[in-house]
Amino acid sequence: MRALLLLALLLALVLGQRLVAPEEVARAQVIQKALPAVVRVQGSALSPGGEDVVGTGFFVGPSQVVTNYHVIRDLKDLTVRLADGRTFLAERYAVDPGIDLALLTVRGARAPGVLTFAQVEARRLPLGMGVVLVGFPYGQGPLASFGILSGVGPLEVPLPDPSVGAEVGTYLFTDAPLTVGNSGSPLLNLQG
C-alpha cells in the first residue's frame, strides 16, 4: 500500500512538471526581459482644464523612449517612471502624428533595458501567433497581458489638420487587452 502511494506521488510529481506549457514559459521569459525597458509616461495638461494623461513607453536606446504621439500630444512637464519606481524628466525629440509615434529623450537616466525592433515585413507575421503587451494600464503596473496577432492590414488614420490628409499604414491588430494607460506599450512576440 505504501509503495503504491509513493508511486502515485512520484507520478503526480513527474506529470505536474509538464503542466506548464512551453508557450507559457516563453511568455514569462519575454515579460521578464521587457520589464526593465518599459516605462510609465506622464505629464501635466498643456491648457488649464485639460486632462493629465498617463501612458506607456519603452527604451529603444540608452536615453530614448518610444511612445504613442497621442499620449504626449497635449502634455507638458513630461516624466517617465521606470519599473523600479525612479522618475526622470523627459522631452520630445521627434514626433510623427500620422503614425502616432513620439520619440522622447530621458534626462539623467540610463536605460535599464532596451527593446529592439525586428526587421520583419508585417504581412509575413502569422495570424494567431502569441503576443505579449507590457504597460501601465490606468497608470498602474507595470502589468502584462497576452493574446494573439489577430490581423495585419492597412488602417487610414485621419490627421488633426485636414489639409494634410490621412496617412495609411500597415497596422498590427491584437486581441490582447488594451486599456487606458497601455497606449505606447510594446507588442512583443514570444521570441521577444
Cite the ranges covered by each PLM segment:
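Proteins with a high burden of low-complexity, intrinsically disordered sequence enriched in S/T/G/P/A and R
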Residues: 14, 28, 76-77, 192
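Active-site region of chymotrypsin-like
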Residues: 34-48, 106-118, 143-191
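Conserved active-site neighborhood of the chymotrypsin/trypsin-like protease fold
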Residues: 19-21, 47-54, 59-143, 171, ...
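N-terminal targeting leaders that route proteins to membranes or the secretory/organellar pathways
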Residues: 1-38, 42-45, 50-52
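Short, acidic/polar N-cap/turn motifs at the starts of alpha helices
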Residues: 28, 38, 77-78, 184
